[in-house]
């Protein structure tokens, strides 16, 4: 779980920020890799989400859950982000890296 504070050169509206987060597609999504989450980032509208027990396994642990987006007096926005440290950060991240390397031709079968 992370408390995130962001500031932009040109401040978007909250709705624009949510739309950009939800529509984000990275290289793993563009390549349609087997372990890549279909929707990498999801925004949760509930005031008490994301929560570890309820949301850590989103997209089999490979997705990111974001919620509680609020305007901030120092930064533009603040929000809570949640990802699975072992699945997304270590084991699953390593698998995703290997899949990316193979898809881009850096790893080839003998």
Model-derived regions: residue spans:
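C-terminal substrate-binding/catalytic lobe of Rossmann-fold NAD(P)-dependent oxidoreductases
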Residues: 1-78
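Generic C-terminus detector
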Residues: 76-110
